[in-house]
């Protein structure tokens, strides 16, 4: 059976601010109105981060807009949500977080075979000069692609 993946929210800022060392997939504990809201695309992970507390993983600052027809069943849009991973994986991540400068960030939220999943990244913060360097590389790559397009256009 083929898995259907629909990306709901991406955290592009995480790739700019951090070096992503490893990626993991985790489930997330949600209420029904939150799932409906996510299916409609009302989710933001721009400022979200992950905390490990007593062997459990929690995502903080993940904004899910209230479902418009949810009335009293709607929850706080910024509430703390539990991530679902195996204990062994959580212990492994917890030990890696003890290293200096490592953190866990949310990279994306997506639907996989009808279930809401979160892509978690083990990340190391970039310095300002690293950010400038990555911007320069991106600009250089864009200029090269434009030059190739321009030359191919005039060949015809």
Give each language-model segment a name.
Residues 31, 60-61, 86, 107:
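A secondary-structure boundary/capping signal
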């Amino acid at each position: 059976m083929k898995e259907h993946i629909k990306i709901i929210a991406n955290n592009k800022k995480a790739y700019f601010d951090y070096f992503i060392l490893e990626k993991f997939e985790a489930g997330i504990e949600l209420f029904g109105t939150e799932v409906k809201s996510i299916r409609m695309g009302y989710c933001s992970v721009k400022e979200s981060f992950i905390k490990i507390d007593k062997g459990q993983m929690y995502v903080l600052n993940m904004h899910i807009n209230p479902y418009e027809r949810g009335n009293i069943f709607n929850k706080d849009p910024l509430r703390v949500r539990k991530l679902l991973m195996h204990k062994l994986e959580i212990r492994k991540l917890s030990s890696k977080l003890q290293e200096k400068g490592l953190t866990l960030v949310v990279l994306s939220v997506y639907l996989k075979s009808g279930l809401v999943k979160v892509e978690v990244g083990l990340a190391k913060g970039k310095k300002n000069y690293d950010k400038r360097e990555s911007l320069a590389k991106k600009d250089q790559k864009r200029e090269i692609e434009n030059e190739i397009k321009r030359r191919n256009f005039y060949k015809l």
